Amino acid sequence: MESLRITDDLENIDPNIRIEKHIDNFEDTRIYFMFYIFKSQDSPIFIWVSDSPTFSTLSVSMKIPIEKSPVTSHLLESNSITSNDSSNSLSQRIVIKFKVQTFLSYSISQDIPEMSHFIEKTIFDLLSKYLKK
């Protein structure tokens, strides 16, 4: 058990993954963003967005040849229907824009349309920057 350790520096352990973190504020709410980006171009991305240290939803979205729009599924659902719906629709839009399979955990406690728009814009801006590297 002594050799067991928790680290936030995964990149030093595995050079095939890059972790990007971002904190932003919407009015009085602090919003945390974390991106796990694998170095292989065919690999999915994992995005965690939350206003608290929780992991209550997880959806996956991907483009498949027989469907016109990306298919989405909940892997972990919260009690909040709004959070589940936001996670699904946002992960679909990420797949459409960036053409990459997406795992998204979206745990925002408030259902404010302006905040949702702010979060989506922030994610898209950050992904545009991170996926170019």
Swiss-Prot record:
Q: Name one GO biological process term.
A: proteasome assembly
Which UniProt keywords are present, listed alphabetically? Chaperone
InterPro entries, per this entry? Answer: PAC4
Pfam families found in the cross-reference section? PAC4 (PF16093)
Protein family (similarity comment):
Belongs to the PSMG4 family.
General function of this protein = Chaperone protein which promotes assembly of the 20S proteasome.
Question: What name goes with this protein?
Answer: Proteasome assembly chaperone 4
Provenance organism: Dictyostelium discoideum
Q: What is the lineage of its organism?
A: Eukaryota, Amoebozoa, Evosea, Eumycetozoa, Dictyostelia
